[in-house]
Amino acid sequence: MAKFVVTLRLPDTIDEDFISRIPRHRAFINRLIEENIIEAYAISADRTRGWVTMNGATAASVQAVVEQFPLYQFLSEVQIDELFVFDSAASRFPRISLN
C-alpha cells in the first residue's frame, strides 16, 4: 500500500456551519487513525492549511476517503501527492531504556 500526503486549504472565514461539523469531523479522523488509513493529521497554527498522511492503493482511493470528511465541502483546495519516502519517530522501534 502506498503513502500519500494530502494538503488541505481551509476556508478564510469559519462560520457556525463549519464549527458545528468539527466534532463529527474529528470523530471520523480518529476512526481513520485507528484503522491505520490516516497516519498523521495536522492543522497549521493559523488554521489555514492542513496535512494528512494517508495509506491507500491509489490517489483516487485517497481522494474518495477525503471526500467523506465532514468538512470536505468547506475545503477550497485539496492536493494529493504520493510519497517516495516517509520516515518518522513514530514508525521506529521504541528506544531501549537501561534502567
Where are these regions (language model features)?
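Conserved, structured core segments of small domains
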Residues: M1-N99
